[in-house]
Amino acid sequence: MQPPRERLVVTGRAGWMGMGRGAGRSALGLWPTLAFLLCSFPAAISPCKILKCNSEFWSATSSGSHAPASDDVPEFCAALRTYALCTRRTARTCRGDLAYHSAVHGIEDLMSQHNCSKDGPTSQPRVRTLPPAGDSQERSDSPEICHYEKSFHKHSAAPNYTHCGLFGDPHLRTFTDHFQTCKVQGAWPLIDNNYLNVQVTNTPVLPGSAATATSKLTIIFKNFQECVDQKVYQAEMDELPSAFADGSKNGGDKHGANSLKITEKVSGQHVEIQAKYIGTTIVVRQVGRYLTFAVRMPEEVVNAVEDRDSQGLYLCLRGCPLNQQIDFQAFRANAESPRRPAAASPSPVVPETFPYETAVAKCKEKLPVEDLYYQACVFDLLTTGDVNFTLAAYYALEDGKMLHSNKDKLHLFERTRELPGAVAAAAAAATTFPLAPQILLGTIPLLVLLPVLW
């Protein structure tokens, strides 16, 4: 049987803060939920300090000289009591915070499972080792396990890398190179695996507008062995930080902390995060008022999920739900047709958009290849009227050039491009039959609609 210490460390890799196989199913089920809630209610924008309590508890139970050794149930209970005390101290500022209330219930559950009394000693604060003289951000003596490629090459062939990106109104390129235009208003998980959680929030471009764009992004790097502490990065409209939520720029105080680094490429516009311990690179940009996201990640990490059935909303892996996808081709066909005169009755507020020809010309300037990035650019100018969306599509393609491992798959094209020709052939065949004129007139609209209904 695995000793408690090892079980704690193993679970640290796979989840948020679960207690390993020794904990009951109810406790293990709590922590993924808590991770999702923490994405939605981050400490960076709230006086509630539950994230600090979570981090301190995990630090106390995952590594270092104060971590519970084998059969150290009393010490583990002491860590739980310290965790409970921390939550009580922040209770006044956490009223109504779902992450806080989930943590409180989780503590009660774990104390019950481990037969911990509510009264008793608490754990001592973790003794942090001082960094060597100089800048603590520049340590380079990371253990091999904290460098994914070195560790991987030792045991097998080079890893296969995949790419996912989100930009514009919003458009999603999945890890499997599917390209979708989605509604997805509100908060949605882009990535949810054993090492990383990424959540985006999309809001209407203007009140009353159907067009949405990414206004908020939260990335949670989970605690990983001797490499990194749990770290949270959050960006919002008009605020692209150059550091994690706790002010640091690397993975914390562990020996391999330098395997997670954040670098500001262009102040307030472009940030890059390198997570070498999982072979991952993330690019976050602010273009105009809105955010774009791009990631390069090994397939092994992409698919590292505990419960595959619970990953239905992992957008980068699964794509957008069907009821959230927009038929981009039908919209374009509508836009290409002559505009009807404005209706006399009042209509909802919509942004002032570009004529189709102008949108095409502006997108051509930045995106000469008429691929799906170009089509996305045209779509965004037609729906938002914001010329910054041209740059969003351009930078999404540039990030793809840097992050995608297969340059032959960089440009994606419409898979149904042959359909209009097929419809024309069907229409020609239909005219060879001696049908009554009124039946033919009824058939033609249906044939025209086939590309939309396909």
Swiss-Prot record:
Q: Which residues form the propeptide?
A: 48-169, 428-454
Tissue note: Expressed in gradient in periventricular layers of the developing nervous system. In adult, expressed in scattered cells throughout the brain.
Give the residue range of the signal peptide.
1-47
- List the GO cellular component terms: cell surface; endoplasmic reticulum; plasma membrane; side of membrane
The record gives the membrane topology as: Lipid-anchor; GPI-anchor
Family, per the entry?
Belongs to the repulsive guidance molecule (RGM) family.
- Which PANTHER family does the entry mention? REPULSIVE GUIDANCE MOLECULE A, RGM DOMAIN FAMILY MEMBER DRAG-1
Protein name per UniProt = Repulsive guidance molecule A
**Species, as recorded:** Mus musculus (Mouse)
The uppermost taxa in this organism's lineage are: Eukaryota, Metazoa, Chordata, Craniata, Vertebrata
Give the gene symbol: Rgma
